[in-house]
Amino acid sequence: MKTLLLTLVVVTIVCLDLGDSLICYMGPKTPRTCPPGENLCYTKTWCDAFCSIRGRRVDLGCAATCPTAKPGVDITCCSTDKCNPHPAHQSR
């Protein structure tokens, strides 16, 4: 009986731990599991001095809170697995 109870406890802990792991894109085709406590994916886009040549810069990643937008910087946040694909790789 104790073995069954211990097994159930271990299975419960493993299942709860897996449920908290969010997967976000860190690059155009690079999904990674976020560290504990970082439960949001973000996409940050902006223009720099070379925007007319190479287009908008893109930063993807995980965050505990949605980063604060600054003038000229667009940020979107989401909370489901792989919800922040690189804008160039989104299906149309």
Swiss-Prot record:
It comes from the Eukaryota. Residues 1-21 form the signal peptide. Its main location: secreted. It is found in: Secreted. InterPro entries: Snake_3FTx, Snake_toxin-like_sf, Snake_toxin_con_site, Toxin_cobra-type. It holds the Pfam family Toxin_cobra-type. GO terms for molecular function: acetylcholine receptor inhibitor activity; ion channel regulator activity; toxin activity. Belongs to the three-finger toxin family. Long-chain subfamily. Type II alpha-neurotoxin sub-subfamily. Binds with high affinity to muscular (alpha-1/CHRNA1) and neuronal (alpha-7/CHRNA7) nicotinic acetylcholine receptor (nAChR) and inhibits acetylcholine from binding to the receptor, thereby impairing neuromuscular and neuronal transmission. This is Long neurotoxin 77. It comes from Drysdalia coronoides (White-lipped snake).
